[in-house]
Amino acid sequence: MRVIASSIRKGNIIDQDGKLYVVLSAENIHPGKGTPVSQIEMRRISDGVKISERYKTTDQVERAHVEDHDYNFLYADDDGFHFMNNESYEQLMVPKDVVGTAAPYLSENLTVKLAIHEGVAVAITLPQRITLEVVETEPVTKGQTASSSYKPAVLSNGVRSAVPPHIGVGTRIVVMTEDGSYVERAKD
């Protein structure tokens, strides 16, 4: 399906010169003088090579037909990450380079969206927010409650994040999966 370059978003799959690319970032740039352009960073799915392309915002780009399905994460091994389709119970192995930076956030039975192209997983989409436990942080210091400074913390998946001073070890917090940033204390 052909679309204009300015409508391409992160996570889209593009078919360029017979090869599939997953969009890592897409930015529309409107200079004061000249033609607006779309700066798109992509990763080739077949071998993981990253490229950066610039298109006029009105250029036509071929977007590959992919189907998004919900999958539950089962386990990881040396071959890759194993998922199960929620409807058909069919299992699918996804290579490590496709999962990429999403790997630390995968936990047993977590539901994710996998983009499937011709029977092969080409991209993964995590839930926007996920609940994790703080396993290491500095102790709470009295009198710090008025300041809005954040302190470093290590979460149960090994990701480092910045948390407010009142958060201690063992506290469950909600973080954004995109960058690991603190959202709120978990309500459970």
Curated annotation (Swiss-Prot):
The gene is efp. Pathway: Protein biosynthesis; polypeptide chain elongation. It is found in: Cytoplasm. Belongs to the elongation factor P family. SUPFAM superfamilies: Nucleic acid-binding proteins, Translation proteins SH3-like domain. One of its GO terms (biological process) is peptide biosynthetic process. InterPro entries: Elong-fact-P_C, NA-bd_OB-fold, Rib_uL2_dom2, Transl_elong_fac_P/YeiP, Transl_elong_KOW-like, Transl_elong_P/YeiP_cen, Transl_elongation_fac_P, Translation_prot_SH3-like_sf. The keyword Nucleotidyltransferase does not apply. Involved in peptide bond synthesis. Stimulates efficient translation and peptide-bond synthesis on native or reconstituted 70S ribosomes in vitro. Probably functions indirectly by altering the affinity of the ribosome for aminoacyl-tRNA, thus increasing their reactivity as acceptors for peptidyl transferase. One of its GO terms (molecular function) is translation elongation factor activity. This is Elongation factor P. It holds the Pfam family Elong-fact-P_C. SMART domains: EFP, Elong-fact-P_C. It comes from the Bacteria. Its main location: cytoplasm.
